[in-house]
Amino acid sequence: MGHRLVVVLLLALLVAGAARAAEQAAGEDGIRGGAGADHQEAAGITGGLSRRSFPAGFVFGTAASAYQVEGMALKDGRGPSIWDAFVKTPGEIANNATADVTVDEYHRYKEDVNIMKSMGFDAYRFSISWSRIFPTGTGKVNWKGVAYYNRLINYMLKIGITPYANLYHYDLPEALEVQYGGLLNRKIVEAFADYAEFCFKTFGDRVKNWMTFNEPRVVAALGYDDGNFAPGRCTKCTAGNSATEPYIVAHHLILSHASAVQRYRHKYQHIQKGKIGILLDFVWYEGLTNSTADQAAAQRSRDFHVGWFLHPIIYGEYPKSLQVIVKERLPKFTADEVHMVKGSIDYVGINQYTAYYVRDQQPNATTLPSYSSDWHAAPIYERDGVPIGPRANSDWLYIVPWGLYKAVTYVKEKYGNPTMFLSENGMDDPGNVTIAQGVHDTTRVAYYRSYITKLKEAIDDGANCIGYFAWSLLDNFEWKLGYTSRFGLVYVDFRTLRRYPKMSAYWFRDLVSSKN
């Protein structure tokens, strides 16, 4: 028993020492120097990457969303969003967690922006909570919410962090969902454009980079095809229709995006000199075999994923594969809508994390029509017994750096090489790792090094990519996973909300501060 007690005490001292070292490296002034061995190990292993590896003016930043980091969900005049309603359903979120407080960036924004600055980042891609500005979606303004975003934007500019503002990250005001069905109703187009215009008018003198929606495909598919995200609708759910609703919602999202862009271009862009675009997620799909069927399945998967939104925005119509398969269930654009939608971006953000193999899978007589079954394809995560890549904590996230190269190159070749930036990229660890374990995130360092190397290769091969945003600065509320997933460069103790920079934070500091 004596020997065991000594071992336990030694382990406790080691963990406490690691935690103290990490804590000393964080604080209101950001990263203050070293975190002992972790910093030494991170230093000098950027894999030959530096700022000079990328074009002049290339932007490095981090990304987050309002619902995941702000907290103050029920205070200072903010109205509930569909996610506030969704998390109240027992069993929907791991451990029945909520984002009522999350990492409290609402009060700690200076600390977090200081951390970004100390890491050498140029920009912060944040989102504005629609229901914090308009608690019921339209009408009366919540000026306390406006004041918060003014404080955040002004502080970022004060210390040299460029704001990239996203107008919608999954968090529709619940009042609009209750009033007329939210995104299923065409009224949402004008409501969103009104909200967007208020933001342009209020913040556009300082914000010069706008995004309308983050991952509209996720909004439509997970919210209305399988019901895993708010508002939780699907054919097998309490309410919904997986065969039609995802396409209706996507159509309204595209029109909402284009309507907001139209207002910005007609009324504000020539004065404010800003740019506007949209953020699209893109898993790379690789045919399982070289068979014609599997290669066609891979192309359909790309069409139903990124093409669902980017094809209309670039070419004014849905991909041919969607038109052929979905038929009358796919809404159509009028001539005026085509004119509004086509070309409605100054740039596009690509959120890229992973890649899958796919094989052809044609529906049979028992297959229920749905967005997911319309792909006529099945994702496969290994080939000949070999996984496509190591898996992170999330069951959907495999580490496949070559997928990023192929995704960026595909956007370049398929869509006329639009100006783009990598608007999200990262991996997660389990939520229950200790501080000492969490800050020693060697797998995340290797992930970023390999993915950013592939991004550089794509740029060297001609992709017009102007920036990169890591997801995310902080561990935070990860939607269905609650606090059981950690994507941050900075470890957050969810009990005390203290921030502890991880090895990956020092790695990024070495990368973006290096001029060689």
Swiss-Prot record:
Class in the EC hierarchy, top level: hydrolase
For biological process, the GO terms are:
carbohydrate metabolic process
Q: Summarize where a beta-D-glucoside binds, as residue positions.
A: 68, 169, 214-215, 353, 424, 471, 478-479, 487
Enumerate the glycosylated residues.
96, 290, 364, 432
Keywords in alphabetical order = Disulfide bond, Glycoprotein, Glycosidase, Hydrolase, Signal
What's the catalysed reaction? Hydrolysis of terminal, non-reducing beta-D-glucosyl residues with release of beta-D-glucose
Q: Which domain of life is it from?
A: Eukaryota
Name the Enzyme Commission number(s) assigned to this protein: 3.2.1.21
Q: Name one Pfam family in it.
A: Glyco_hydro_1
Cite the InterPro entries for this sequence.
Glyco_hydro_1 (IPR001360), Glycoside_hydrolase_SF (IPR017853)
Report disulfide bridges, numbered on this chain: 234-237
Q: Which one of the record's GO molecular function terms can you name?
A: beta-galactosidase activity
User: Does Signal count among this protein's keywords?
Assistant: yes
Q: Which SUPFAM superfamilies match?
A: (Trans)glycosidases
What does UniProt give as the signal peptide span?
1-21
Do you know which PANTHER family this protein is assigned to?
Answer: BETA-GLUCOSIDASE 1, GLYCOSYL HYDROLASE
Q: What is this protein called?
A: Beta-glucosidase 1
Q: Which organism is it from?
A: Oryza sativa subsp. japonica (Rice)
